[in-house]
Amino acid sequence: MDQPAAAEIVNLHKTFKTGLGKPVVHAVRGVDMNIRQGEVYGLIGPNGSGKSTLMKALLGLVRPTRGSCSIFGKSSLSPDSREEVGFLPENPYFYKFLTGAETVAFYGKLCGLSGRSLKEKVRELLDLVGLSDAADRRLGGYSKGMLQRIGMAQALVQSPRLVVLDEPTAGVDPLGSRDIRNIIENRKNRGMPVFLCSHLLEQVQEVCDRVGIIFKGLLIAEGSMNELTRDSDKQEILLEHASPCLLEELKKMVREDGRAVWLEDGHPRNSL
């Protein structure tokens, strides 16, 4: 028997009333989506496109106007569906008077951990997010990137089967963004499904197996990054140790073809 999808959304509609005599706002319009076991799924779209509303419906934080959402086969409207989900909201709030270790321990206790298992989990997660050296510092002295990494730690504290991240690099500098990306890749390598909401194309390109593009509440495209960004009218050739003579010969062949056009050449660039 096939395993259920990590998360499934079927014909989701969500409207909001804005006031007496005013038209309703259609935040999400008939979206179908599934997040497979072991994949990183990225939902991308501009601000106000419906990303956060869709994510909140999946987590059972808002009730769908029509349609359904489920997590590991359980309805999102059931509190049980959230027991195995780790969630990092956009701009999470933390108690600034607590240290990093105390913060992770606080969320661990909320999830039922205690004693030695709690201490080991706190130590493990602070090491994972690169904050072992700052474990005893109060959050009031943390940078934005450090706070986001503490947010990642609290999202993982109960060893969830699914992690949901809403704009995990919001307000974070490039180095902090890379740290968070590495944490996501670490979870992916362990087979944990991740649902990532973002408005940053570069972020989803780097870590996501599949991507959905949402605009004005509609899922207008979905697929792998290769499928979504492929230009079928062009061919790309990548050569190594090609001599100038070989390149000139290739350009000559293109000119003689009559239809093909040599657009550009140069050395490929690597990400910093």
Regions found by a protein language model. Give the residues of each.
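ABC transporter nucleotide-binding domains
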Residues: 4-7, 14-215, 219-221
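ABC transporter nucleotide-binding domain
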Residues: 181-271
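A structural detector for beta-sheet-dominated domains
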Residues: 10, 36, 240-242
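Short stretches within intrinsically disordered, low-complexity N-terminal or propeptide regions
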Residues: 8-9, 262
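Generic marker of residues within folded, mature protein domains
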Residues: 2, 18, 227-229
